[in-house]
Each structure stands twice: as C-alpha cells, then as structure tokens.
Amino acid sequence: MTRTTTTRKANGGGDTVKYSIIVPTYNEQLNIAMLLALIVEAMEEGTKRKEGRKIPPSSSPSYEVIVVDDNSQDQTQQTIQKLQKIEKYRDILRLKPRKGKLGLGSAYIHGLQFARGEFVILMDADLSHNPKAIPEFIRKQEEGDYDVVTGTRYLASSSSSSSSTTTTTTISSRIMNNSSSTKSSRKSKIKEQECGVYGWDTRRKLTSRVANYLAHVLLNPGVSDLTGSFRLYRKTTFQALVSSMQSVGYVFQMEIIVRAKRGGFKVAEVPISFVDRVYGSSKLGASEIIGYLKGLVSLFMRV
C-alpha cells in the first residue's frame, strides 16, 4: 500500500481520524501554504520515530487540518481552495469559513463542530508555532495519557514537565528563502532555540510577561504559560470544557486551562519556541489588551 493510499484511507470521506488540527485564520494568505507544508512534514516524518526507532508510514497517525477563516480580506480562502486541489492536501485540508471576526475562542469552537479526531490540536496560522513540535505534544500525551498538553514559552527544558524542546530552524530557513525583510533576517539567527519568545521587542515581551504574571496572581492556574494557544486536547475533554465557557476572545485560553485544572483533568506542558510573525500584522492591539484585562478580572470573579 502506498503512502498516498494509506493517507486517503485514514483521512478521506467520513472515516474517523485521530488528530484534528484547528487553525483560525484572518488575512494569512502569505503564511497558510507554508504552515500546511510544515504540518504535513511534521506529521509524516516526526511521528515515524518512537523511542528512537523508525516506524512504517502506515503507522503514522491519521489527521486533518481544519482552517477556520474569519472572512479574510486578502486571498486566504482562495489560497486554501487552491491547496485543496493538490493531491497530498486534498483529503486532509478542510476550510470552514465564518462571516466575520467573532473571536479566537469561538473560532476554535466552530472548528470543533467539524472535528472528527479523537484529539484536537490548536495552533496559530502565522508560523509563530512550529509544527515540528506537534509530535512532541503527541508523545507527551501518550506518555501520561493526558487530557490536555499545553505548550509553554516560559518553562526550562530541564523541567520535569517535559524532556523535549522544539526548534525554529526549519521555519526560519524556509522563510529566508522567500523574504529578505528585517524580521526574516532576525529569524535566521535563531539556532536550535529552547523554549522562549523570539523576535519580539522589549515592550511586547514585557506586555506578555506582565499579562502572564497577572493571570497567575489572580487565577493560580498551575501551569507556567496561561496565555499560550498551542495546545492538544482530548476531544471529549475539550467539548466538556467549552460547554461551560463564557470567553470567546484571547481570554478563552486562560479560562479553559483554569477550568481544566480545577476540573481535575490531567494537564501536562511541553516547552516550545514562539517566533514573531514575518508576514502580515499582529492581531494584538490596544483594544485586545483592554479586552484581556477586563476578561481577566471577569474570569477572577466567576471561575
């Protein structure tokens, strides 16, 4: 059986898949093709090694990529539709658009409606999250039969929460082949980094640290990175958690992990590298920061 045949059998039609990767997008035309290529590479190559031994292609996990697009004003949807016509993407790539920007949390919930996997993986579309880390999330989940595995930018790789690190080398080198921008040049200097944030200026790093610190003081979540969005959930766990959720924006990430910990679900962390986007602009502005602070206080009062 060829790899193509195996993939189609696992991912096509109404068959159940093991992993549903949900990717919200808004104006990600320049990133989505690269992201998809890296996801496929990670799933087909990274998961072929278990305990240092290669495993046959037929043992690679079945998966799908669900893109939830919030009515992008560029060619994001058209790019995805073109990618769906490519044979290796045809059976794994699914586009589930919405009419407008309705919040990051609600985008995940929208994608969940279409997820066929036993597990759901949430990640950003702007290449800030390295798909090469996905096999580490999978390995960690299998290692302890965890309900949630969350990526952390703030946990040393020597921590007992995980024995692995991820790199940004692949993304950096590939982007360098397509861009000569200052940001791209900065990314090319990153070599085998462990967990952390790269490419942000001091103000952005400070904002993130303060936001995470405030969240820890008010919520005592029991994880090192409360605001990160690169996560793996058992689908039944995710469904149970979102059924009681009230947040739909960036606060969604905090509320769901707090509810998971307080609800007795098994949660683990995996160190990740977070790299600033090269193409497009950040969705985080003053209104999002104000919304975050309001949401944090609201979350403190009701959770």
Regions found by a protein language model. Give the residues of each.
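Cell-envelope/extracellular polymer assembly enzymes that use nucleotide-activated donors
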Residues: K18-S20, E64, E255
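Acidic helix N-cap motif at the loop->helix transition within catalytic regions
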Residues: L30-M34, D74-L83
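A conserved hydrophobic helix/loop-capping motif in glycosyltransferases and polysaccharide synthases
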Residues: Y19-E28, L35, A42
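Conserved donor nucleotide-binding strand/loop of the catalytic core
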Residues: S62-I66, Q77-F114
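A conserved acidic beta->alpha catalytic loop
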Residues: D69-Q78, L127
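Acceptor/aglycone-binding surface of glycosyltransferases and processive sugar-polymer synthases
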Residues: R98-F114, F119, P131-Y250, R277-S287, ...
